[in-house]
Amino acid sequence: GVAFDDGSYTGIREINFEYNRETAIGGXQV
């Protein structure tokens, strides 16, 4: 199961999304 409560899990998801998006832009990938 998920080891985080909804708040922490959502926060981590948001951080990962931002990181992946910035990485994609930095790598010139759309």
From Swiss-Prot:
<comment type="subunit">
    <text>Tetramer of four alpha chains associated with two or four beta chains.</text>
</comment>
<comment type="function">
    <text>N-acetyl-galactosamine and D-galactose specific lectin. Binds the Tn-antigen structure GalNAc-alpha-1-O-Ser, the T-antigen structure Gal-beta1-3-GalNAc and IgA.</text>
</comment>
<comment type="similarity">
    <text>Belongs to the jacalin lectin family.</text>
</comment>
<dbReference type="GO" id="GO:0019862">
    <property type="term" value="F:IgA binding"/>
</dbReference>
<feature type="domain" description="Jacalin-type lectin">
    <location>
        <begin position="1"/>
        <end position="30"/>
    </location>
</feature>
<keyword id="KW-0388">IgA-binding protein</keyword>
<protein>
    <recommendedName>
        <fullName>Agglutinin alpha-1 chain</fullName>
    </recommendedName>
</protein>
<dbReference type="GO" id="GO:0030246">
    <property type="term" value="F:carbohydrate binding"/>
</dbReference>
<dbReference type="InterPro" id="IPR001229">
    <property type="entry name" value="Jacalin-like_lectin_dom"/>
</dbReference>
<keyword id="KW-0430">Lectin</keyword>
